[in-house]
UniProtKB/Swiss-Prot annotation:
PROSITE patterns: GATB (PS01234). Gene3D superfamilies: 1.10.10.410, GatB domain, N-terminal subdomain. Belongs to the GatB/GatE family. GatB subfamily. HAMAP family: GatB. It holds the Pfam family GatB_Yqey. This is Aspartyl/glutamyl-tRNA(Asn/Gln) amidotransferase subunit B. Keywords: ATP-binding, Ligase, Nucleotide-binding, Protein biosynthesis. One of its GO terms (biological process) is translation. It catalyses: L-glutamyl-tRNA(Gln) + L-glutamine + ATP + H2O = L-glutaminyl-tRNA(Gln) + L-glutamate + ADP + phosphate + H(+); L-aspartyl-tRNA(Asn) + L-glutamine + ATP + H2O = L-asparaginyl-tRNA(Asn) + L-glutamate + ADP + phosphate + 2 H(+). Its EC number is 6.3.5.-.
Amino acid sequence: MFEVVIGLEVHTQLNTKTKIFCSCATSFGEAPNTNVCPTCLALPGALPVLNEEAVKKAIAFGKAVNATINKKSVFNRKNYFYPDLPKAYQISQFDIPIVEKGELFINVKGENKRIGITRAHLEEDAGKNIHENNFSKVDLNRAGTPLLEIVSEPELRSSDEAVAYLKKLHSIIRFLDISDANMQEGSFRCDANVSIRPKGDTKLYTRVEIKNLNSFRFIQKAIEYEVKRQSEAWEDGTYEQEVVQETRLFDTTNLVTRSMRGKEEAAEYRYFPDPDLLPVLLKDEFLDIKIPELPDEKKARFIDELGIKESDAEVLISSLEMSRFFESLISQNLNSKLCVNWLNTELMGLLKGELTIENSPVDAQKLGVLIKRIEDGTISAKAAKDVLAFVFENTSVEIDEAIEKLGLKQVSDDSAIEAVIEQILNANADKVAEYKSGKDKLFGFFVGQTMKEGKGAFNPAKVNEILKTKLG
């Protein structure tokens, strides 16, 4: 039996307005090579100037994961050649990163586990190579975008743990609002270092790096395939030949990893301090940066203060947008449990395909009005589902307008309900007698008959109240 050893390196693009060492915009999707200047193009004489906002965002992350924030950190040149790296070196941090010795906690199959974070350092992103037909093109818009590289300890023992760690990290980054962490656009990318060893062995064996994984599903599949490949090689006696220190890519079509190149050692990059950048010396006020409420804190507050079930609270903190939507709902002085049900179950049940809570056709204000109409008895919960479906498809229609159009307004007028109840009781005198002699279950019969006669428009609470008075 083997034990799996996984360490993850995550590159997240920080959401600063400008690049890390120049004033070019960081906006995604612009025409190729338009967000560039002499600094990102590495023209002679162009000098880097550090973006203060990138430093603040790195510090915020460090505080969120209980890390040590170094008052002094140093930028280094990482030397290698690639077409999308115009300087032929990347400005990064090596021996003195801005953040080190952090931690976060994951929960897998009901068990909590601490995962150490070795370091988080600032660096610049490279450009992008685009291969079309027989040509390769280079877009340098991304070159110089600020990255925070977050390196975990090799303490993850399964693909499930790796995905749980990444989801937790992704959530923290989003709640801090230091990155949009959009995996599809490449602003949250993961490299997985995977090795195996016999159970009980503490030695670290040959690790393989799988590069640029950009979805939780692919990360899981890539790790599972690589573990299977290495395990089979060990059992077949071909481990030393088949498993070498290398970088592999994940084939998302066939769900296999393929060899890309040999894995470089740190010495091969010839790191040395960048002579164009002074060491970063942090003043005390930088270390006092306030960070927002994090997912675990928010979850605890929802449970303790609002009486929400843990499973529901998990859904509410599943994304920054979801928690913002919920907090916007409860800020309207609504019943928190009703809000949870109508958000987690009813609205989320309608959001399919490209629709997410972020671009939901029904916003928090509109859903809040619907919940108010349930609370004040204007409509029943059953009718409210029809109203929600209607305004979901007809976005320009307001809740009250939809209630009128659909004719779903409840009758709460005592005299109208009383008149119908009188008719039903008179027509069922025998059942009234049975009820009064102790057959309490007949109460449901009278409620059902009244609601049927009122064609579902009667306020159920009013019906119950009047029936109890009439039946004594």
